[in-house]
Amino acid sequence: MNENSPPAPKSTDLPLPPVVDKSQSLQGSRAIGRLGESAKITAIIAIMCVAFWVVKNKLVKANVTWAVVQEGISNVPYWQIGIACGLTALNYLILTGYDWIAVRHLKKELPMTKIMTGAIVGYSYGNVLGWLLGGNAVRYRLYSSWGFSFLEIVAFVSILATTFWLGLFLLAGVAFIALPIKLPEEVSEKLIFDHHVWGLLFLGCIGLYLAACTIFRKPIRVRDFEVTLPPFSLSTMQLVVSAGDFLLASQVLFWLLPSSQSAEINFSTVLIAYLTGQIITVLTHVPGGFGVLEGVLVSFFPEESLGDVLAAVVLFRIIYYFLPFIPATILLIYNEIRAKRRPKDAVQDI
């Protein structure tokens, strides 16, 4: 080698960058996702088991057997069952307002028949199977076949959730402040504050939301997302529709109580118990609130009336949950058949 030639480059001891196997990374993320879903399902089952355990202990303590519940069912007059069925039909018409508000806020045009189909199917499946397993899944199926994008459906479901909480807060606020409520001691102790304070807090949240809808007319940017609040007229419709929904649903439950118990158990207590059950059901994602609603109701009412209360819940689940599930399933199957025969329906912006 020539002495004047430049020295050969020295080898380095630095390690080479690791080779990332994208397939393994993807498999790992999927495994984590499956683990998370399994944990979620396990938690839901555990909550249901705890709820049923609470109900069972209450019933054993009150000496309530299935024969007592059957007797309570037989004591409900047919005319009260007829009223409950009529209120259920009216309630499901009111539920259409949830989807109508969401469609209007997204500035989309969709035939009223499809809006009604989406609402009836979505809420029927949500009531029986839960929102994660039923309601949101069938809504995605329906609205995607009608031309809604994934992000539009996400926004759609967010509007439905907002409307739900607005009506719940409004009714709970009014009930806590203005209505004669008889809360059991074990429930009152867990409220931390007096129920009148909770009523003011709930109504305060409603006032802040309406004020925000009036003031912020331009989209609010949150990181990479833009949130557009509905106009005041549409936000008041959210309150009317959701409050009407909860009032009618709790009226269905109230009318299924035997006549002898209706005088002892006032509607305002039934309303608060039903709203409490709805809150816990939504937060825990228990399908249909099975066990949760029963657990709340047996905690709100005296032991001597538990047989009649459980009888009312059994009838309520049949009339309000399972009967609408039949036409909802027929509508879903009909929509699936139509979707396979023709391309996706176009949805127009207003």
Model regions and ranges:
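Predominantly cytoplasmic-facing regulatory/coupling regions of multi-pass membrane proteins
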Residues: 2-120, 178-282, 304-306, 310-311, ...
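Cytoplasmic juxtamembrane interface segments
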Residues: 12-24, 128-143
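Hydrophobic alpha-helical membrane segments of integral membrane proteins
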Residues: 40, 142, 154-157, 161-162, ...
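Membrane-interface alpha-helices at helix entry/exit sites of multi-pass transporters
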Residues: 113-117, 131-136, 145-162, 305-316
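Transmembrane alpha-helix interface/packing and boundary motifs in multi-pass membrane proteins
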Residues: 121-130, 258, 275-294
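Mid-bilayer segments of alpha-helical transmembrane spans in multi-pass integral membrane proteins
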Residues: 123-132, 161-177
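Re-entrant/interfacial helical elements at transmembrane boundaries that shape
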Residues: 133-145, 284-302
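Discrete transmembrane alpha-helix packing/kink hotspots characteristic
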Residues: 151, 167, 323-327
